Amino acid sequence: MFEKLVFIAVLTAAYAADKRKLTAHLNPFCGDKQECGLCYVTAEGSNDTLHYFWSVLGAPAALSIQTPLDSQLTSISWDALRKHNLREPIFKFSGPVLSSSAVVISKLWEYNDPDNKAKMNATMKNGTHNIDERHLLWRSIEGCVGNGSSMVTATFVANGTNSTDDEGFFSRNGTIEFTLKIQDTDGHDTQLPHLFYTSSSSQIQLSLLSLSPQLGKTSQFAFELTVLDDSSRNGSYRISNETTFDDEYTPGVFTNVAVFNAQENSMSTFYLHWKPVCYRDPGRTVTLSVDAAIYNSTPAASWWTFNVATAWLAHRAPKVASSAISVAFGSEGDGWYQENGFATWAMSAGFGELPQEHVSATVLSVTSVGLGIPAIVALGTVIYVSLHKPEPKL
């Protein structure tokens, strides 16, 4: 009995050490709530505080700043934010900043795929159509509430544009949705692809719903993901594609994609990870899912384009590492985007070492039974034959 109590106490202490207190603030320090558009969340842990800034000003972006526990946000220069002014510091803290990182949906485009092979060819004449994110019309933020809650979410929805070149995308009430979520402890997301998250990570989702393709019915969609980080000393990232036999969390997907700095091991290291899959219906039916293929990773030369992430990280240069990764949706023979008019993709971004998925007890037990029973039968057969082997006739 005593041993059980000790075990429970140890588990409780470990859980409490990893758990964070979440507090959400919608448009902090902003007098005119209609012209702000920022969700700010603090995640207070036992050793540090993570400050999350989510916004679509300029481009959809998620900025994460790590500080000591006693360092607090003291002001936001909303005038500079509204004027897209990179020269003036936007966020000010009462104490030091340990590290900061960001993920930006820096480009979004439609690409022509006439052979339905999900192969993006940027050199093809009229092969791509970029959506100008600067002119997207975003609704008021949905969510961004909670004080001491176990989860905070915020959704940004664009349902129109000021660009005449792009207004056709929204002719069927189409929307572009940017959803962010953090949780106070570790676990797997309830929705496919059931990404593993920690209390030091955020989950980011991009959804393209009922858009009207402008390049014809044979097109797909792709986007550029810009990664920024000031905790990296060598300024470069590594992309890892690991194959696993375990698809219990993401049926039919046996690959994990991770972006991280292989030479960093400190807790300030920043990483991304996702499953290379895009779902084509609200129910996230496995049979309707398609690939989310990585095309290239290059230094993000254009990362200075204004958004909430560059508003902060421009003042952390020149030690900011950057990388731009192109991700394209589609699989060979999938019927293109217009078949379902739906595409959703998710990733996780966090501080610390890249978390490793572990095979669950369920899979271990099933594997043990699956391999163990045939082994027992084979061993029993060998023993039986050995014991009942007929004597050779003389």
State each model region's role:
Residues T344-L394:
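C-terminal single-pass transmembrane alpha-helix
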Residues F2-D32:
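N-terminal signal peptide
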Residues F29-G31, E35-Y40, G143-V145:
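Sequence contexts marking disulfide-bonded cysteines in secreted/extracellular proteins
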